[in-house]
Every structure is written in C-alpha cells, then in structure tokens.
Amino acid sequence: MKPTYCGYAAIIGRPNVGKSTLLNQLLGQKISITSRKPQTTRYQILGVKTFKDIQVIYVDTPGLHASTERTINRYMNRTARGALRDVDAIVFVIEPHWESQDAWVLDNLKEIETPVFLVINKVDKIKNRAELLPLIEKVSSLYAFQKITPLSAKTGDQVGTLEQAVHQLMPESPFYFPPEQVTDRSDQFMASEIIREKLMRLLGQEIPYSLAVTLIEFRKEEKIIRISAVIWVEKKSQKGIVIGKGGERLKRVGTNARLDMEKWFGKRVFLQLWVKVKSGWADNERLLRELGFEE
C-alpha cells in the first residue's frame, strides 16, 4: 500500500499581515474571514488541504501582539502560542518591511525547534522585487529560517512554492481528516464568522473589536437553513451604530452575510439578526468563555 503523509503547519504573525488570506489561498476556498482590520481572526481555525498522498492541516491563528491590556488580547495570544505546540512546520508571515512586533513574534519562536518558513507577503504592492533584498538579508541574519518565500496571498503568486516546501516536512502518517473535508469548524461557527466579517467590513473604525456574534438558532430544513443570531456590543451607543439609520446598516450586514452563507452551504438561507448590549464582555473571562473564546 502506498504511504501517505500528514501533519500540521501553523500560520503565525503579527495582526493584519494576511495570514487568513494566505490560508484561504492555500485551500483554494474561503474558510477564514478577512478584513482590513487588525485582529479579525480571534479563534484557532484548521484548514485541511489534501493533495494526492499528502494532507496538510494548516492552523490559522489570531495575530500575536505585544499589547495585553485587554483580556480578549491575552486570550488571543494564548490561542496563537498554543498553536505552536506539536506542529510539524511554522509559517511566519510578515509584510515587505520589518517591524518591532515582528521581532517580538520571532522572539516567541526562538525556543521552538520546529522548522520555520518565513513568508514575505503583499509583494504585489512592490514594483521592483530587488527592493526586498535588504529585508531578506536582515531577516536571514536574525534566524535560521527553513526557507524565505516572497509571495502574494492576494494574487496567489508563489503560494505554490511555499506549499511544496511545506509538503516536504510532512511526516509519514495516515490522514487525520477525510480528503474532502476542508475545516474542523462546524457550520454554526462558519455562519457566525461570516456575520462578524460583514460587520467588520461595514463598520470601518467605529466599533473596531467591541462586538461578538452568537447563534440562537441554526436549523437545517430540506430546502432552506434558518439562522438567528445575536450581535453583542459593549455599549448602548454602539448598538445604534451597528443598526444604522432606520436599520439600514444591519440590513446590509444581513444581506451580505446571507449571500455568502448561501454560497458556503449550497442552499437558501433565512437569516435574522438582533443587536444586544453586554457591557465589558471583552474584559470579562467568564463572558469570553460564554462567547466561545478558548483558554
């Protein structure tokens, strides 16, 4: 019987460097929400890619950041660091410049023996690739990376090169997931994340991270899925911002989310949304656990 190869690769980096976009590009479909806002990803999400006799389970993580003032930030840091345990490869994503937060993330890797690939993302914004040479020289002096790959997660340029390099580190093992499975997350989780993505994209900087989404109904019928969700905010003033004048903004969120859900689930979706206030949820450990955040 022909051997198979299977293992885990964690995708890490500071917030807003394109980790989720990279995961979606590697998988060839969207499973992790994206926006221009830092810290869009709050949970550890597994993306499964099976190619012939190789299966890679990519671990998308929240952005690692030095600021731990808020309880929610500490939760996300613990989630990201936890993803580094027992993986076979680490993909460290940066932008085409080195920042102090990148150095802070790198410090978290120096005690880990797992091979680290450095990805320089967003090179589609660079006119002359020669501009990257000083950065490559600098980062090469900081750490013995397995490979340094400039790429564009947005366009897919050179993503295949990274994927082939990751494949070479996967140990011989049975597949952990059926070949057709693409994520470990439930349909309910995907529905709530789609809603949160549409909120973050429409709200601009008005309510950066003071919202969460929970489902109160998810019912699959023969031809339709019925979903009811609550959008939680921290202050009464934020409730009005989310709803918008005459309910216009909430209606747009619902329409955009429903269209994405119908693509994901392959059937019609009936979606109802409510907005409620839960004061201080982002700094309350009990409330964070209730809203699905992991230790």
UniProtKB/Swiss-Prot annotation:
Gene Ontology molecular function terms on file: GTP binding; GTPase activity; ribosomal small subunit binding; small ribosomal subunit rRNA binding
Membrane topology summary: Peripheral membrane protein
Chain positions covered by the region annotation G5: 151-153
Region (G3): 60-63
Segments traversing the membrane: none
Segments for region (G1): 13-20
GO biological processes: ribosomal small subunit assembly
Subcellular location(s) per record: Cytoplasm; Cell inner membrane
SUPFAM superfamilies: P-loop containing nucleoside triphosphate hydrolases (SSF52540), Prokaryotic type KH domain (KH-domain type II) (SSF54814)
Entry superkingdom: Bacteria
Domain (Era-type G): residue spans on this chain: 5-172
Gene3D superfamilies for this protein: 3.30.300.20, P-loop containing nucleotide triphosphate hydrolases
Domain KH type-2: 203-279
Metal-binding in keyword set: no
Region ranges (G4): 121-124
Keywords: Cell inner membrane, Cell membrane, Cytoplasm, GTP-binding, Membrane, Nucleotide-binding, Ribosome biogenesis, RNA-binding, rRNA-binding
Region of interest (G2), residue spans: 39-43
GO cellular component terms given for this protein: cytosol; plasma membrane
Record-listed GTP binding positions: 13-20, 60-64, 121-124
PANTHER family membership: GTPASE ERA, GTPASE ERA, MITOCHONDRIAL
Task performed by this protein: An essential GTPase that binds both GDP and GTP, with rapid nucleotide exchange. Plays a role in 16S rRNA processing and 30S ribosomal subunit biogenesis and possibly also in cell cycle regulation and energy metabolism.
NCBIfam families per the UniProt record, alphabetical: era (TIGR00436), PRK00089.1 (NF000908), small_GTP (TIGR00231)
Family the UniProt entry places it in: Belongs to the TRAFAC class TrmE-Era-EngA-EngB-Septin-like GTPase superfamily. Era GTPase family.
Official protein name in the record: GTPase Era
UniProt gene name: era
